[in-house]
Amino acid sequence: MKIIYFSFTGNVRRFIKRTELENTLEITAENCMEPVHEPFIIVTGTIGFGEVPEPVQSFLEVNHQYIRGVAASGNRNWGLNFAKAGRTISEEYNVPLLMKFELHGKNKDVIEFKNKVGNFNENHGREKVQSY
């Protein structure tokens, strides 16, 4: 499964690099409108008061048919808006919210994400994956 991510401050990029997963693509202003022709999990940060970043919105407008799950980063100081972009994407595109993590994540978050991606790959197409 492809992992597509957007990193406004570098936290999500650091998180993804720590997973050592190979099939990844970073969304940028230059490529956010390019089509992707395979299923993916999207990982994004949250901006402002819980908003989905504009490049992610643009990317999903073009590629929403291939999204299979979402994970989100945030800062717990934002309370109920912590990693809210993940919940927003999950609800809008009816896909599971696999996890939320703070900033660039802890080691346990990296392990959890890799396990969930692995389980998702195993179960994809056979049963619904449990949402976070």
From Swiss-Prot:
One BP term from GO: protein modification process
User: Which SUPFAM superfamilies does this one have?
Assistant: Flavoproteins
Task: Give GO MF terms, alphabetically.
Answer: FMN binding
Q: Which Gene3D superfamilies match?
A: 3.40.50.360
Q: Which NCBIfam families match?
A: nrdI (TIGR00333)
Q: List the HAMAP family hit by this protein, alphabetically.
A: NrdI
The entry's function note states: Probably involved in ribonucleotide reductase function.
Question: What family does the Swiss-Prot or TrEMBL record give for this protein?
Answer: Belongs to the NrdI family.
Q: What is this protein called?
A: Protein NrdI
Which gene codes for it? nrdI
